[in-house]
Amino acid sequence: GNGDAVIGINPATDNVEQTIKLLKLMDDVIQKYEIPTQSCVLTHVTNTIKTKEKGAPVDLVFQSIGGTQATNSSFGVDLKILKEAHEAGLSLNRGTVGNNVMYFETGQGSSLSANANFGLDKQTCEARAYAVAKKFDPLLVNTVVGFIGPEYLFDGKEITRAGLEDHFCGKLLGLPMGCDICYTNHADADQNDMDNLLTLLGVAGCNFIMGIPGSDD
């Protein structure tokens, strides 16, 4: 069901105080109803470190990552910052996930859109991002497969191919790999394409999917 692995909020602002309010809101619900899950506000990792320092109930530390140093720099992170965030998450000893306190999002095309792919193809860059993720023992690694738009994944067929490629490479690396099955409104794709990809990933043994209404993430 929805929320088995994490209940997440994509915030409208990176304001630290607002992030703390959202974390406390979700924690109150989880504690009240004794839900065996984790919460996460999908804010920048440096903000999560700040909320932790202020005593916020942080279960999972979120960050978007890429497969080259330049891509990660465009996201405002490097391996040192991710290591600091990982240690901060471990120090809280919360949730039900042991030492798996990181939640990473990836997606084909991010390195190309940042002009940080150094001539590599989208899938090679994506697989390299999974190697970054694996270093930090994540609970979740999530490819947001269609978010990049038709400039990089043109239509439903390309989004479907990318989703299956990402799932395959995640499995090869032994990651807790999942998929946010989604598409942009200006891509040559529709809800049927997303439902087809959902079915294919289910048959392929995908660990989890993001339950977004209308696949409109």
Predicted feature locations:
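Anaerobic metallocofactor- and corrinoid-dependent redox/one-carbon enzyme cores
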Residues: 1-217
